[in-house]
Amino acid sequence: AGTTYRASFEELELAEWERQFFANVHFPVFLLQRLVKRIRRGAGVVFTGSLMAVEPHGMSLSYGVTKSAVHALAKNLVKFLAPYGVRVNAVAPGFVDTDWHRTKPAEVRRNIEGKIALGRFCSPEEVAEVYRMLVENSYMNGAVVVADGGYCYR
């Protein structure tokens, strides 16, 4: 789904910035370029964006910017993939209850949960349902679906 690099703006290094763009933007683009002729008509491609591309934060500039690029990619590829009959969308997950998030201190988790209208992290199964919907729904194309439980609306 991508990589992240946490550094202040002043400490950001070009090599890490480029690594983020390679992993989060360049790799999906050129992988899709190699596969597009093998994808059956009517199929859908779903990229993984992020809530951090929608709601800016101060933890990782490169992550937010590259995931914003993924959202733009899903929208812009619509025209390029139309001749192949392939749809393209993206999911922008919020905070998903993964092993990585479970290692966060309880106070940090409570702070995040306090900003989510539903008051909890998304389960992996819940976010998987969003991906499944985008794959199965033959009319969804060029969408970025934010699955964040109402982050910042509480």
Which residues fall in each region the model found?
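Short, small/polar-rich loop/turn modules that mediate ligand/substrate recognition or access, typified
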Residues: 82, 87, 141-142
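Substrate-binding pocket helix/loop in short-chain dehydrogenase/reductase
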Residues: 8-9, 16-21, 101, 108, ...
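Conserved NAD(P)H cofactor-binding loop of Rossmann-fold oxidoreductase domains
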Residues: 1-5, 149-150
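Alpha-helical segment proximal to the catalytic Tyr-Lys
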Residues: 37, 79-83
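Residue(s) in the substrate-gating loop at a strand-loop-helix junction
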Residues: 50
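C-terminal substrate-recognition "lid" of short-chain dehydrogenase/reductases
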Residues: 38, 120-147, 152
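Active-site helix of classical SDR
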Residues: 32, 66, 74
